[in-house]
Swiss-Prot record:
InterPro entries: Glyco_hydro_1, Glyco_hydro_1_N_CS, Glycoside_hydrolase_SF. Belongs to the glycosyl hydrolase 1 family. The gene is BGLU14. Keywords: Disulfide bond, Glycoprotein, Hydrolase, Signal. PROSITE patterns: GLYCOSYL_HYDROL_F1_2 (PS00653). The lineage of its organism: Eukaryota, Viridiplantae, Streptophyta, Embryophyta, Tracheophyta. Expressed in flowers and endosperm. SUPFAM superfamilies: (Trans)glycosidases (SSF51445). Glycans are attached at N193, N221, N270, N415, N423. This is Probable inactive beta-glucosidase 14.
């Protein structure tokens, strides 16, 4: 391990020397700053029919042919349902002080509000939460991370029906009542601004609805359904916050927010139309949800482009939104890209930003915007972290913020072994760069209070299945063995404040490094 760490140290020193940036250290962040890892129920738990759990929308979707790139599913995933104590020990040895996870709606309420609370599901999450607390790890809980009971899709169409607002409020209150005495941080939803587009515009995610030219699905309307679903999520969020504020927050002392996906955008060309394209891309991104929640209505750019396709809030709904403002914003940031205008210029269909009438690009004049990662749509562009955090700081009056996801992907296939993944210097460089950028934003006044690496373990990555690996720990999916990657040692040393403070005892090693 000592030799391996020396390789990491030399690599990071070299990269910093070449880039001219300073090393990042734990002392550059506030003492009470949360540092953790993130996950979600469907991606790690497995046990999909155990403990009287009901079917979720993702249980059904992944069993349909052609929905997942490698034909896989989350039936077993990382088997966190049975191995959660082992995973808590990994977190404890890593040195994190928080763990962000989600609660499986179908494990707690197999039939939504149309059935009983499942005591086996409650027992599992009580055991997980208690295990974390005993190790000094703060639970940071997402109420809904994509998965909903299949019953609700079957009964009334899931997020396309206003009925789901009642179900989500009921589920949220069950969670507050059962777990809120130990949970100090709640997020209602995880990045619905991204998942809704993939679910109802492109058809990549459950329930797989879309229409041409966005995709060729059996059912759906890509021009209308994403905004209907998004509207119901915003109102569901407001209702859940209202329940928490009025009945639980005073005695439980927690906070509640929402997590959104935030890609940072730069103009492809420094022209008026591409600068406007950046503005539209941002408005159709996190601001699609944050503007109504914090400012009372949808962004002007969305209304101008979508017209009557964008639902309207009633006066009563606006009052509810204004009276239930969140305590913090969660930002999931992975990458930066260029965008060009598609209103005055011909474009291909962009799977994420077509509704904003922009097209995303990852190189300009043959030069990549940043180093590619294992995910084709994520590039390593650290400056985007500071730019994005600063933008949302200014737009939303410096609302307290947590970086709820940030991570690096390695491409994977069945012929690769653990050794192909454990020497993950690319991940170390990525996290280091983004933390440097985040620390700069904090020094300039951004009220950021936590950072979570995605993810603790390699896991099921939605429509990509197991072809992408984001974990600090490698998971062998046949044996489920967890193996630390080099980034584990890096993150541990960062958290203990010893990163890059180790001195070379052998001056010849330093000479060798300088000539590397």
């Amino acid at each position: 391990m000592a030799a391996a760490w020396l390789v990491v140290l030399l690599t990071v020193h070299r990269l910093l020397h070449l880039s001219g940036v300073s090393a990042v250290d734990r002392s550059q962040f506030p003492p009470d700053f949360l540092f953790g890892t993130s996950s979600s129920a469907y991606q790690v738990e497995g046990g999909y029919l155990e403990g009287n759990k009901g079917l979720s929308n993702w249980d059904v979707f992944t069993h349909k042919q052609g929905t997942i790139e490698d034909g896989s599913n989350g039936d077993t995933a990382n088997d966190h349902y049975h191995r959660y104590m082992e995973d808590i020990e990994l977190m404890h040895s890593l040195g994190v002080n928080s763990y962000r996870f989600s609660i499986s709606w179908a494990r707690i309420l197999p039939k939504g509000r149309f059935g009983d609370v499942n005591p086996d599901g409650v027992a599992f999450y009580n055991a997980l939460i208690d295990g974390l607390v005993q190790k000094g790890i703060q639970p940071f809980v997402t109420i809904c991370h994509y998965d909903i009971p299949h019953e609700l899709d079957e009964r009334y169409g899931g997020w396309l029906s206003p009925e789901i607002q009642k179900d989500f409020s009921y589920f949220a209150e069950v969670c507050f009542k059962l777990f809120g005495d130990r949970i100090k941080f709640w997020t209602t939803f995880n990045q619905p601004n991204l998942s809704i587009k993939f679910s109802y515009m492109d058809g990549f995610y459950s329930p797989g609805r879309c229409s041409e030219p966005f995709g060729k699905c059996a059912l759906g309307n890509s021009s209308i359904e994403p905004y209907v679903a998004g509207h119901n999520i915003i109102l569901s969020h407001a209702n859940a916050v209202s329940v928490y504020r009025n009945k639980y927050q005073g005695k439980q002392g927690g906070q509640i927010g929402i997590a959104l996906s935030i890609t940072w955008y730069e103009p492809f060309r420094n022209t008026t139309i591409d600068l406007l394209a950046v503005k539209r891309a941002l408005s159709f991104g996190a601001s699609w949800f944050l503007d109504p929640i914090l400012l009372g209505d949808y962004p002007t750019e969305m209304r101008e482009v979508l017209g009557q396709s964008l639902p309207k809030f009633t006066s009563k709904q606006k009052n509810r939104l204004q009276s239930t403002k969140l305590d913090f914003i969660g930002l999931n940031h992975y990458t930066t890209c260029y965008v060009k205008d598609c209103i005055f210029s011909p474009c291909e269909i962009d799977p994420v930003n077509a509704d904003a009438r922009v097209f995303s690009l990852y190189e300009r004049d043959g030069v990549p915007i940043g180093k590619a990662t294992g995910a084709p749509f994520f590039h390593d562009v650290p400056r985007g972290m500071e730019e994005a955090v600063t933008y949302y700081k200014q737009r939303y009056n410096n609302t307290p913020t947590y970086i709820t996801e940030n991570g690096y992907s390695q491409a994977s296939n069945s012929n690769m072994t653990a050794k192909d993944f454990t020497n993950d210097t690319g991940r170390i460089t990525y996290i280091q760069g983004y933390l440097i950028s985040l620390a700069s934003a904090i020094r300039k006044g951004a009220d950021v209070r936590g950072y979570f690496v995605w993810s603790l373990l390699d896991d099921f990555e939605w429509n990509f299945g197991y072809t992408l690996r984001f974990g600090l720990y490698h998971v062998h999916y046949k044996t489920l063995k967890r193996t630390p990657k080099l980034s584990v040692d890096w993150y541990r040393k960062f958290l203990t404040g010893s990163l890059l403070r180790r001195k070379f005892r052998d001056e010849s090693q330093l000479h060798k490094f300088n000539s590397y």
